[in-house]
């Protein structure tokens, strides 16, 4: 493209040359576009020619900078030695030498740019001076060559062209400098890669030598085996010959020709002996020069031969297998491996992608195993299978892939995922199918070895007897124990009755006796049962003036169920109405035969108030213990039973335990029921801290994580992990039982709604907090017995300890009342209860608690409907009165009729209507009642179908409140 002035003179340095910027290898042409309304536009279209270079061609770097032509006579100013823009387009193909541009003669006009220089073709390498005539060929005009339309350039366009040429010159200088730096960097990179190739070749040579030594040793062993077994010798040799040569980028072994591979299949060699394979250093590709097509064809052919197993083919045909000559591959360095981004520049590089050494080694080992028919030996393991297990965990325990297990299940017709849970039976089938042995375990196995450990017979020593005092309420059990202990426990009990189970230890004639005091109230049945189970001897206290009572009979049954001997203590013999012989006779009805009546049960007449015959009672206890021959092993870990448990504000969870065997020390890790903890302190019945608790010794244990249930067994375990595992298992078991019990009682939502509609049962929600677990259990059992078909008490929450804010929140959510038994609420709980309107009631006697709850539950009962007969009246005549309706003229035949009473209309001895009287008149006056023998007028509410001869029955309905 060129521009002209108005006088058709070209603006350029040389008046004979047009100012152009022609791109090398690009042809330009003009295309005219047609638009609507007869408009047209000429568009310049550039066509880029692709030049394909042959391997024997020289690159165009040598002809990149031709000498400038001699100036023409008509133009004395020499052409500026401006570098061609086309030369800047190929800096990456080669590293040309940077030539300093010749100083150009300043142009007479500052706005005139330098003369354009076009890229010479390959045929233009000959100097222009050799053309015939000794003159340069006249260049065709641009307009003649391309047929473009010449337009006039403005001054701004000429300035833009000039600035573009100057920027092109600056860019060319910068690109040449960058090319020099790139060439230097590539040289350093090539040197580093060559060093790495040498190191890799050295390692491969060492690996080849090691493999060769192993192959020689294996071959010698096979030859020796073949000598001993002559028959399979031929097969062994054929297998050795058929084994392929190692593959990969390994250097050729010394002593072997690298290029003289014998022809396969008897084919003659073409082209004589093949040249030796180039070394790794020589095989490095030249930057900017593509790999020759012949070398590419050889490389591809060798790869195809490897894939087709050419070594095996040659071995089968009888030719000795020799390693093939493969085109060396460039080993990737660590930086190249880490550079995972695929770019155009990296993809166009001649360095091919190659496998790592580890991948090649694994590939060779796998190929060798496949050739030698070596299979990995199946390892059979003992797999521990719990009750439930996931497929993923089962696969890990068998060291199998979960995919293989899923495939096996799919063959069996079951679609499962690795996270699915299966039972122990299915897991056992899968493990046995995969060749493993199975060991079945259950969650309850965590408790194995805790209880029932056999004692060492040589370490057994005598232990004190454990005695439980049982009997009816107010028969003097606690008073008798106080007299023995020289203490006063009765004064500390609310209401003078025992509501806790207590354990004490006394000493008589140098021998210790452990006493367990149980409540006698009917609500404490479970306490008496626990006391009988944890004892050796049961003392049955019977008042001489009261004889045998219901709780006395219950205590006898508990002792017989526990299988413990009974000693009868006939108390209160100091009273005038005492009759010990009556007590002995009454005990005969319950199979208790005392010695004085010809039986084997010891009986002692005592008086706790006057302390009479207490020594005889203790002697009887020691005699019975001597007969039982009680022994225990104090050197083993401690086991026992929880007598009582409570939550103390200052000390936390406190459990009163009875050590049955072993010795308990501070610091031992204890598991009691679903709670565990480390023993922080041991306190005896006198409040003293002790260093150990031996067999048959009651102590208070501090340090448990929670409050256990009374009656739970405890044991000492080895570590905290074992204790935590046992406690979690028991908590989960208790939670599952509670859920099953609730779901079984409630059923589904529809069943619950139907049950409520049919039965109409009302609930009285309660939150119960007590001082000890035994009292809470007794209160819960007593409240359950109060329930009927219409109303029952629902225990929302129960626990040992004081009343807290969480209890108030729970009571608010469930609309329940809070009951505190021997506990109080803290200030925050009281404030929250006042704010929310929650009632808190405190009790210290179980009688009062049960009576109040019973009265409150009675208020929920629907009142009883009572019907009282008043009288009958006969309808004599029916009158129709305006604005009133039908009025019956009646005579009272029996009793009386009251206004507002309920009435029934009887016709032919059938009740056809039941309602109320609207009006009752005698003559024209309203009256309250009409006695028998008098006449009156009656009208019914919302009913007019009355006839003469019908009978009206009057009655009164009363609602009477009920109690439980």
Swiss-Prot record:
Gene3D superfamilies named in the record: P-loop containing nucleotide triphosphate hydrolases, Translation factors, Translation initiation factor IF- 2, domain 3
Protein location: Cytoplasm
One cellular component (GO) term of this entry: cytosol
UniProt: GTP binding residues: 471-478, 517-521, 571-574
Record region (G4): 571-574
Residues covered by region (Disordered): 1-379
Family statement drawn from the similarity comment of this UniProt entry: Belongs to the TRAFAC class translation factor GTPase superfamily. Classic translation factor GTPase family. IF-2 subfamily.
Protein name listed in UniProt: Translation initiation factor IF-2
Organism: Brucella anthropi (strain ATCC 49188 / DSM 6882 / CCUG 24695 / JCM 21032 / LMG 3331 / NBRC 15819 / NCTC 12168 / Alc 37) (Ochrobactrum anthropi)
Protein's gene: infB
């Amino acid at each position: 493209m060129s521009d002209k002035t108005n006088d058709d003179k070209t603006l350029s340095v040389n008046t004979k040359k047009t100012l152009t910027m022609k791109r090398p290898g690009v042809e330009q042409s003009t295309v005219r576009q047609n638009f609507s309304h007869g408009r047209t536009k000429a568009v310049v279209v550039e066509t880029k020619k692709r030049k394909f270079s042959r391997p024997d061609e020289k690159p165009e770097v040598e002809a990149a900078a031709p000498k400038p032509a001699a100036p023409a006579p008509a133009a004395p100013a020499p052409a500026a030695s401006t570098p061609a823009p086309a030369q800047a387009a190929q800096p990456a193909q080669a590293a040309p030498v940077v030539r300093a541009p010749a100083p150009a003669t300043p142009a007479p006009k500052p706005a005139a740019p330098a003369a354009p220089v076009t890229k010479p073709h390959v045929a233009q390498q000959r100097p222009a001076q050799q053309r015939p005539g000794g003159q340069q060929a006249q260049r065709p005009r641009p307009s003649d060559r391309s047929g473009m339309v010449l337009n006039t350039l403005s001054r701004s366009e000429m300035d833009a062209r000039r600035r573009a040429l100057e920027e092109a010159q600056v860019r060319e200088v910068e690109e040449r400098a960058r090319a020099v730096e790139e060439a230097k960097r590539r040289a350093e990179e090539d040197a580093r890669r060559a060093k790495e190739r040498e190191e890799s070749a050295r390692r491969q040579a060492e690996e080849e030598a090691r493999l060769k030594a192993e192959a020689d040793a294996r071959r010698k062993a096979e030859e020796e085996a073949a000598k001993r077994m002559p028959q399979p010798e031929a097969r062994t040799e054929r297998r050795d010959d058929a084994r392929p040569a190692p593959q990969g980028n390994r250097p050729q072994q010394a002593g072997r020709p690298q290029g003289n591979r014998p022809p396969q299949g008897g084919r003659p060699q073409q082209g004589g002996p093949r040249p030796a394979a180039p070394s790794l250093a020589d095989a490095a590709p030249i930057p900017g020069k593509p790999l020759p097509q012949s070398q590419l064809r050889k490389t591809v052919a060798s790869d195809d031969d490897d894939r087709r197993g050419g070594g095996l083919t040659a071995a089968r045909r009888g030719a000795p297998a020799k390693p093939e000559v493969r085109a060396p591959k460039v080993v990737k360095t660590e930086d190249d491996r880490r550079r995972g981004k695929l770019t155009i520049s990296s993809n166009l590089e001649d360095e091919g992608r190659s496998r790592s050494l580890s991948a090649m080694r694994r590939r060779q080992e796998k190929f060798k195993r496949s050739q030698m028919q070596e299979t990995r030996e199946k390892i059979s393991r003992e797999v521990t299978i719990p009750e439930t297990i996931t497929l993923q965990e089962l696969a890990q325990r068998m060291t199998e892939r979960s995919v293989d297990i899923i495939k096996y299940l799919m063959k069996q017709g079951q679609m499962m995922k690795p996270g699915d849970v299966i039972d122990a039976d299915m897991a056992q089938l899968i493990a046995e199918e995969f060749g493993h042995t199975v060991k079945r375990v259950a969650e309850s196995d965590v408790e194995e070895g805790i209880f029932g450990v056999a004692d060492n017979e040589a370490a057994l020593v005598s232990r004190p007897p454990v005695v439980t005092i049982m009997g009816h309420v107010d028969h003097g059990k606690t008073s008798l124990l106080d007299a023995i202990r020289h203490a006063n426990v009765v004064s500390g009990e609310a209401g003078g009755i025992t509501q806790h189970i207590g354990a004490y230890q006394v000493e008589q004639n140098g021998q210790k006796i452990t006493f367990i005091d149980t409540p006698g109230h009917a609500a404490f049945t479970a306490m008496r049962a626990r006391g009988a189970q944890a004892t050796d001897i049961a003392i049955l206290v019977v008042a001489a003036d009261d004889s045998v009572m219901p709780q006395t009979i219950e205590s006898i049954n508990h002792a017989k169920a526990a299988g413990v001997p009974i000693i009868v203590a006939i108390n209160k013999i100091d009273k005038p109405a005492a009759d010990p012989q009556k007590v002995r006779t009454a005990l005969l009805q319950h199979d208790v035969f005392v010695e004085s009546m010809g039986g084997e049960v010891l009986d002692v007449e005592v008086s706790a108030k006057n302390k009479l015959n207490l020594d005889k009672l203790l002697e009887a206890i020691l005699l019975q213990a001597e007969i039982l021959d009680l022994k225990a092993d104090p050197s083993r870990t401690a086991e026992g039973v929880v007598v009582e448990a409570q939550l103390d504000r200052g000390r936390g969870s406190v459990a009163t335990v009875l050590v049955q065997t072993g010795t308990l020390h501070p610091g031992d890790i204890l598991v009691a029921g679903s709670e565990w903890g480390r023993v922080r302190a041991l306190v005896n019945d006198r409040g003293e801290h002790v260093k150990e608790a031996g067999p048959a010794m009651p102590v208070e244990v501090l340090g448990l994580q929670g409050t256990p249930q009374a009656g739970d067994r405890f044991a000492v375990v080895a570590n905290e992990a074992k204790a935590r595992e046992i406690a979690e298992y028991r908590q989960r078991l208790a939670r599952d039982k509670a859920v099953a019990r609730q779901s079984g009682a409630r059923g589904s939502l529809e069943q619950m709604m139907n049950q409520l509609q049919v039965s109409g049962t009302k609930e009285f929600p309660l939150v119960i907090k007590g001082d000890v677990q035994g009292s809470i259990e007794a209160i819960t059992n007593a409240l359950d017995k109060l329930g009927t078909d219409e109303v029952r008490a629902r225990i929302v929450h129960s626990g040992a300890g004081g009343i807290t804010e969480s209890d108030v929140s729970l009571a608010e959510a469930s609309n329940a009342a809070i009951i505190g038994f021997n506990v109080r609420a803290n200030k925050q709980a009281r404030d929250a209860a006042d704010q929310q309107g929650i009632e808190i009631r405190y009790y210290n006697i179980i009688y009062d608690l049960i009576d109040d709850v019973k009265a409150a539950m009675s208020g929920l009962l629907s009142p009883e409907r009572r019907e009282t007969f008043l009288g009958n009246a006969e309808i004599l005549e029916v009158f129709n009165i305006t604005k009133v309706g039908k009025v019956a003229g009646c005579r009272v035949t029996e009793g009386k009729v009251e206004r507002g009473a309920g009435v029934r209309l009887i016709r032919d001895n059938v009740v056809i209507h039941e309602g109320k009287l609207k009006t009752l008149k005698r003559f024209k006056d309203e009256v309250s009642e009409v006695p028998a023998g008098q006449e009156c007028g009656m009208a019914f509410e919302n009913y007019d179908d009355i006839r003469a001869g019908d009978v009206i029955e009057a009655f009164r309905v009363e609602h009477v409140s009920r109690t439980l």
